[in-house]
Amino acid sequence: MAIQTSNLGYPRIGLQREWKKTLEAFWSNKINEEQFLTTMKEIRLQHVKVQQEKGIELIPIGDFTYYDHVLDTAYMLGFIPSRFSEFTSYLDVYFAMARGSKDHVASEMTKWFNTNYHYIVPEYEEGLQISLKDNRPLRLYEEAKQELGVDGKPVILGPYTFLKLAKGYTQEQFATILKQLVAPYVQLLSELHAAGAQIIQVDEPIFASLTKEEVQQAKEIYEAIRKEVPNATLLLQTYFDSVEENYEEFITFPVSSIGLDFVHGKEGNLNAISKYGFPADKTLAVGCIDGRNIWRADLDEVLTLFTTLQKQVQTKDLIVQPSCSLLHTPIDKTEETHLSTELFDALAFANQKLEELVLIHSALTQGTESISNELETYRNVHHTIRSSAARNREDVKAARTALKEEDFSRPLPFEKRYELQQVALKLPLLPTTTIGSFPQTTEVRQTRKEWRNGIISNEQYEQFIEKETEKWIRYQEEIGLDVLVHGEFERTDMVEYFSERLAGFSFTKNGWVQSYGSRCVKPPVIYGDVAFINGMTIKETVYAQSLTEKVVKGMLTGPVTILNWSFVRNDIPRKEVSYQIALALRHEIELLESSGIRVIQVDEPALREGMPLKEKDWDAYITWAVQSFLLATSSVANETQIHTHMCYSNFEDIVDAIRALDADVISIETSRSHGEFIDTLKHTTYEKGIGLGVYDIHSPRVPSKDEMYKIVEQSLQVCDPKYFWINPDCGLKTRRTEEVIPALEHMVQAAKDARSLLKTNA
């Protein structure tokens, strides 16, 4: 039996975030196009070289991107919206689609399945000419071959997943458009095969959640492609879950290899193989190392998996690989020497995961005795972290055991609470607010860096934060906002900030992963039991409230978002970790309330993204996710108004869950998705406070008052004005002051115009 090592994708951002810095330098005209392309090529080839040096045999080519791999595919296939037709150069068109411009609205951005990565949503328009506009995978394949002598494995997004992720067509049009994709995919694969590509990875993550009819439709497309490209060696790659429900049909697809996730879809995929076997004429690519988390693998467990598979699989070949692209993990743990030994030893970032693949390959080809020392080391590491005091806190266990049913609900129903809140808060019809953060200017970031490096004192840093807070309180008053925020100038990241102040968390120095475009985040590490230590937001929020007669919102990140945006310990269920976080936040919320804060926002932008891919698994997740939010927020008085915020979600799937959160007000991203949630509300009712975002904060353009008024007008057709709020899509941290102030002025004016119209029509 031939066994090879393979990788599905490598992190793009560079060990020191060189990729991010190059992008932003190009966008700000600090480097020209030639310099940009040269530097990007250097980064791209360096990533290939690292994988080569680590001993990976099938190295992914084409996973590298200037922004997003789905956007790459859209451009490659000619899915370019007509509003960008005035742009002529590749990069101008590409980045206009991704980011928008002064006069052009960007394409929508949303979450990549149930991860924290965002992709640009492809747009289909009537009359679109679908063709292979640019064979980028071929260029990159030839580049790696010529520059490094690497005969790589081209990676492309499959036609079915691509079109399922796209928007702009009716369901009736889907089959027709899908057939139109056959020709460009045939050309793409033919040219790669002709250039010498030995194996081509075709990613179809959507296959984990298809109906029987969709599977048959997908199979017909692959049969049409295979008919035209009979000799290309295709690896049909699935990930993020099992394909158990349709496995029997999948293994008959006309491809040479099938990649399955044996981490996040282990039970389902093993059940399917046990029941139906695996074709002897196909290669099984075994996703055995977790590509979405940062913990060392349990090598004994992985080797047991292969023992099981080798008994049930008749194929002559196997591929050892991660469960998915390593895009979702930091690059290398070697710089994290500040961590405790027990935690550092338990980690495995992308480069360490590549080393684990090679270890497994050695054990499978040379016997386990060839890695006996490494196996012993791994066993000791796992024993140490499992028995750690941080993972066995008696106070946390006692608090969990003591929970009662009444801890998960507010005393009064929403309608009665809202009446009391209106009396207490005295807000106008259609109140205006922002989502929480204001621009983190160069000065803010530089001052924080100086403080962290000990260049300025705690007192100097606190004075600076107070100065920024007061400045933006005054801005908000002048603009005319109704509910203000303190601006979050003390926070780098909405999750990292809390991780640094709760027991059970740790944080890395260089554990960056890509979120969207050049935006990178450094997820905290939940390694132990989570517990409250001291107040986390009290000082800044109370100070902001002391500066104004207007209401100031307390700002917290919710338990499910903290969970979903962290690297989470894998020794207990995620539900239990979420409840631990909720109990800690409950304490903080009670402190805010007792300090005089009457509106408290608990953001849950990641609630939807944590949902399992399969609908049959949704209810269990939604139940504990909602319970976590209720546990955090239900101990406040009826007069205290609880807000929450969500973004980047397919909300139609979770309207009932949103309702069950029982938040007094929810703000939701609306403008970037071109009013999608407004359409959802046409078919259901939402009888609580709601704010539908009136402008896209991810684009530098300042929308006009009329644009925002139009969204307000559309929203009021499906929302009760009595409960309607007006706000941006998301926080304003990444925008510049000169963009934020006029945009908020336009928003407030749109609100005033809407109020006037409502009064006139009353």
UniProtKB/Swiss-Prot annotation:
Enzyme class: transferase
This enzyme's EC code(s): 2.1.1.14
Cofactors named for this entry: Zn(2+)
Keywords assigned: Amino-acid biosynthesis, Metal-binding, Methionine biosynthesis, Methyltransferase, Repeat, Transferase, Zinc
Gene Ontology molecular function: 5-methyltetrahydropteroyltriglutamate-homocysteine S-methyltransferase activity; zinc ion binding
Catalytic activity: 5-methyltetrahydropteroyltri-L-glutamate + L-homocysteine = tetrahydropteroyltri-L-glutamate + L-methionine
Task performed by this protein: Catalyzes the transfer of a methyl group from 5-methyltetrahydrofolate to homocysteine resulting in methionine formation.
Protein's name according to its UniProt entry: 5-methyltetrahydropteroyltriglutamate--homocysteine methyltransferase
CDD domains from the UniProt entry: CIMS_C_terminal_like, CIMS_N_terminal_like
Cross-referenced InterPro entries: Cbl-indep_Met_Synth_N, Cobalamin-indep_Met_synthase, Met_Synth_C/arc, UROD/MetE-like_sf
SUPFAM superfamilies linked to this entry: UROD/MetE-like
Pfam hit, one: Meth_synt_1
Gene Ontology annotations of biological process type: methionine biosynthetic process; methylation
Amino-acid positions noted as binding L-homocysteine in the UniProt annotation, renumbered to this chain: 435-437, 488, 603
Domain of life: Bacteria
Family: Belongs to the vitamin-B12 independent methionine synthase family.
HAMAP family: Meth_synth (MF_00172)
Binding residues for Zn(2+): 645, 647, 669, 730
Cited PANTHER family: 5-METHYLTETRAHYDROPTEROYLTRIGLUTAMATE--HOMOCYSTEINE METHYLTRANSFERASE (PTHR30519)
Cofactor note: Binds 1 zinc ion per subunit.
